[in-house]
Amino acid sequence: MQTCCQALLLLLAACTLPAHCLEPTCLHFSELLPARLRELRVKFEEIKDYFQSRDDELNIQLLSSELLDEFKGTFGCQSVSEMLRFYTDEVLPRAMQTSTSHQQSMGDLGNMLLGLKATMRRCHRFFTCEKRSKAIKQIKETFEKMDENGIYKAMGEFDIFINYIEEYLLMRRRK
């Protein structure tokens, strides 16, 4: 009987701990990163053909090497954060309006990006964020000018975005 009560008290105590205490620490983030990026890639594969086949603006590239350079630069964290916000707040909500059959996959992608953004915020001492990005300003302006085609372009290039995130986080991991 006493062991049962102790087990119940331990369970209750664990349930009242803040959520961040139950999550992996920031020190293990770099070890968990490959799996998180793989999950993003697998989920994107479910919708990739839909968006890339509707991208008629093949002479325009939203996610250029200039963005990757910013990700790798001094203020890479800010660029990554802005791009995560761009996809979660602008691209994915509008993309969900284009296809009812892909909403689950897009919702899952959004949740994965939000989780990555939350981890970066929680582990802020590893990621210094402080400056606005010129490349992202250009991306957003081009995206808006393209209207609905911008959705297909941004979602069609989502794999490039994942690769850039990976480059940034692997670079941070080496430091």
From Swiss-Prot:
Q: Which UniProt keywords apply?
A: Cytokine, Disulfide bond, Secreted, Signal
Specify the signal sequence span.
Answer: 1-21
Q: Which domain of life is it from?
A: Eukaryota
What is its induction behaviour?
By lipopolysaccharide (LPS) in white blood cells, liver and spleen 3 hours after treatment. Decreases to basal levels 8 hours after treatment. By primary infection with E.acervulina and E.tenella.
Query: What binding partners and quaternary form does the record give?
Result: Homodimer. Interacts with IL10RA and IL10RB.
Which cysteine pairs are covalently linked by disulfides here? 26-123, 77-129
Q: What does this protein do?
A: Major immune regulatory cytokine that acts on many cells of the immune system where it has profound anti-inflammatory functions, limiting excessive tissue disruption caused by inflammation. Mechanistically, IL10 binds to its heterotetrameric receptor comprising IL10RA and IL10RB leading to JAK1 and STAT2-mediated phosphorylation of STAT3. In turn, STAT3 translocates to the nucleus where it drives expression of anti-inflammatory mediators.
A Pfam family hit: IL10
Which GO terms of the cellular component aspect does the record hold?
Answer: extracellular region; extracellular space
Q: Which InterPro entries does the UniProt record give?
A: 4_helix_cytokine-like_core, IL-10, IL-10/19/20/24/26
Q: Is the keyword Phosphoprotein in the record? A: no
Question: How is this protein named in the record?
Answer: Interleukin-10
Gene3D superfamilies referenced in this protein's UniProt entry, alphabetically: 1.20.1250.10
Subcellular location(s) per record: Secreted
Q: Give the similarity note.
A: Belongs to the IL-10 family.
Q: What else is known?
A: Chickens susceptible to E.maxima infection show higher constitutive and post-infection levels in spleen and higher post-infection levels in small intestine than infection-resistant animals.
Can you supply a Gene Ontology BP term from the record? positive regulation of transcription by RNA polymerase II
Tissue expression from the record: Expressed predominantly in bursa of Fabricius and cecal tonsils with low levels in thymus, liver and lung.
Gene Ontology molecular-function annotations: cytokine activity; protein dimerization activity
- PANTHER family listed in its UniProt record: INTERLEUKIN-10, INTERLEUKIN-19-RELATED
